[in-house]
C-alpha cells in the first residue's frame, strides 16, 4: 500500500492518540538518534529551528531533516565542533482506513464500516513557537550551522525559522 501524502496528517484535528497498550501494533519510529555530534562540550551559541504553525510532523520527516542537518554539519563544521539535538518526540499514532481499489474491490472492501483504521506511523505534535531542532556550536561556525538548519527546514511540513541565542559573556 502506498504512503499517503503528509498533508493528510499535518493538521491537529483531534486529540492525541498515544495509548499504545490498547493498539494491536504500531510501526517503529524511523528516528535513530536524538543527540549527535560532540555531547561533552559546552558551546556559547545555540541555533534552533522554531515552527511558525501548530501542526503534526511525521517521524519520517523528522528523520529526513535530521539526516540532512547532521550530514551537512559533519561535512562543513566537523564532528567535534557541534551538538545537534531533536527537541520533539513522535508520540502521536497515525491511523489509516485502507481502501481496496481495482476490479472487484466493492466485493472485498468494507467501505466506511469499521472505519477506525490501522496504525501506519507516528507523528510529533508541535505548537507554534516550539523548538524542533537545536544546534550548539562555536561563534566561528554559526553561518555554516545556519545553512545546515536551512536544509532541515525544507524537509518539514510547516513554515519555520532559525533563532539564534548566545550565552551571556562571563
Curated annotation (Swiss-Prot):
Source taxon at top rank: Archaea
Q: Write out the GO MF terms.
A: structural constituent of ribosome
Instruction: Tell me the keywords, alphabetical order.
Output: Ribonucleoprotein, Ribosomal protein
- The answer to whether UniProt assigns keyword tRNA-binding to this entry is no
Residue ranges crossing the lipid bilayer per the database entry: none
Report the GO terms under cellular component: ribonucleoprotein complex; ribosome
**Which CDD domains does the record cross-reference, listed alphabetically?**
Ribosomal_L16_L10e
GO:BP terms for this protein? translation
Alphabetized InterPro entries for the sequence: Ribosomal_uL16, Ribosomal_uL16_arc, Ribosomal_uL16_CS_euk_arc, Ribosomal_uL16_dom, Ribosomal_uL16_euk_arch, Ribosomal_uL16_sf
Q: Which family does it belong to?
A: Belongs to the universal ribosomal protein uL16 family.
Q: Extract the HAMAP family matched here.
A: Ribosomal_uL16_arch
Q: What is this protein's name? A: Large ribosomal subunit protein uL16
- The record lists the organism as Methanoculleus marisnigri (strain ATCC 35101 / DSM 1498 / JR1)
Amino acid at each position: 500500500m502506498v504512503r499517503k501524502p503528509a498533508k493528510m496528517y499535518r493538521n491537529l484535528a483531534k486529540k492525541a492518540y498515544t495509548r499504545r497498550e490498547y493498539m494491536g501494533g504500531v510501526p517503529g519510529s524511523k528516528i535513530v538518534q536524538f543527540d549527535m555530534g560532540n555531547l561533552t562540550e559546552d558551546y556559547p551559541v545555540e541555533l534552533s529551528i522554531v515552527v511558525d504553525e501548530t501542526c503534526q510532523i511525521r517521524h519520517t520527516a523528522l528523520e529526513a531533516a535530521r539526516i540532512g542537518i547532521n550530514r551537512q554539519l559533519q561535512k562543513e563544521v566537523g564532528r567535534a565542533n557541534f551538538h545537534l539535538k531533536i527537541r520533539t518526540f513522535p508520540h502521536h499514532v497515525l491511523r489509516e482506513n485502507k481502501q481496496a481499489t481495482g476490479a472487484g474491490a466493492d466485493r472485498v472492501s468494507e467501505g466506511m464500516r469499521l472505519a477506525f483504521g490501522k496504525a501506519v506511523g507516528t507523528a510529533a505534535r508541535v505548537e507554534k513557537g516550539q523548538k524542533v531542532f537545536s544546534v550548539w556550536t562555536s561563534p566561528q561556525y554559526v553561518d555554516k550551522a545556519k545553512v545546515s538548519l536551512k536544509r532541515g527546514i525544507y524537509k518539514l511540513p510547516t513554515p519555520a525559522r532559525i533563532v539564534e541565542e548566545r550565552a551571556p559573556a562571563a
